[in-house]
Amino acid sequence: MDATATDLRVSIAHQTRFAFRLAAALSSPRAHPAAGGAAGAGGSNVAFSPLSLHVALSLVAAGAGGATRDQLVSLLGVPGRGTAEGLHAFAEQVVQLVLADSSPAGGPRVAFADGVFIDSSLSLMKSFKDVAVGKYKAETHSVDFQTKAAEVASQVNSWVDRVTSGLIKEILPPGSVDHTTRLVLGNALYFKGAWTEKFDASKTKDGEFRLLDGKSVLAPFMSTSKKQYLSSYDSLKVLKLPYQKGRDLRQFSMYILLPEAQDGLWSLAAKLNSEPEFLEKRIPTRQVTVGKFKLPKFKISFGFEASDLLKILGLQLPFSSKADLTGMVGSPERHNLFVSSLFHKSFVQVDEEGTEAAAASAAVVSFRSAPVTVDFVADHPFLFLIREDMTGVVLFIGHVVNPLL
């Protein structure tokens, strides 16, 4: 394996680690209210794109300096040897390898866009613009925050609406930008994939889904008798649902991580966070005959302002008056720039046809001896993620506590 491939593998491992750290923080009962505290308390389903957030913060790092850049690299990159340049190289490879649309070739439809909206009184530093446009394929827009902030917010929202095929209509809520805003860095991600093996809608039946509080609801469950990629362990079952492939090497799949315990969701999220290779070691590699199979249909729309959550993870300087973002714009005003907020929204829908989604260790694991058939009954809270299997890049992650929400 050459150095570039090795670097990419290491970068992907850290992107996955970042994904699971965020997922654990969002699913924690102690989650900050501004970062979906209701979700942490078990009150709502969660879906977000760690890849979208990773790219947004990496672009901030392109204009950061000193300790601010170091904090960003520490959270996003390789501890001890990561660099901002490494983040940009990773972003460039992800945009080219993972986020290229494969629908013309018969695979999932993938759309991704980066945007830099800068006040017309300022100009981007050449070094920052070169990275933003060259590595991140960002569009740059000169706008008037100082006298037309509401119109600019509407412009950004329309851009996100277009990229996500109308699934996310508003990334910037009313009042989120004003005359003091100088720069908005945004990205949007859209994914729509059809299952390799679609579910028969006539077999979808209502069944009981048990909630974290012990109550239950009636929800529509998809069912099948076909063989499935499924691995079974003492406290966990992992289901892999592949999407139809295009003619390239990429293979997108959804993974359902179902804890054995009805209330095992939070401890599973914590386990993924504490053991970065936990998932990789449990990915199903062979199809097995299933006995009883039930998977609920679900649709999640989830948004949050991420700065408080990121501060908990140690990223504080970019959001403070001590931020060093002097590499973004060529103006004396650059010394006063900081990230006031980081908005994120995601949408994920799973049904019989497939998925539509948008966003703006060394331990040996032994496989439990599989019986002749394996049941997979997702009738209680579970984690899910959408991943590109060739690279291991996680596009979306979330949890379902109630499929009716």
Curated annotation (Swiss-Prot):
Residue ranges, annotated region (RCL): 354-378
Sites annotated Reactive bond: 368-369
Pfam assignment, any one: Serpin
CC terms in the record's Gene Ontology section: extracellular space
Source superkingdom: Eukaryota
UniProt GO molecular function: serine-type endopeptidase inhibitor activity
PANTHER family named among the record's database cross-references: GH10112P-RELATED, SERINE PROTEASE INHIBITOR, SERPIN
Function: Probable serine protease inhibitor.
Name recorded for this polypeptide: Serpin-ZXB
Organism whose genome encodes this protein: Oryza sativa subsp. japonica
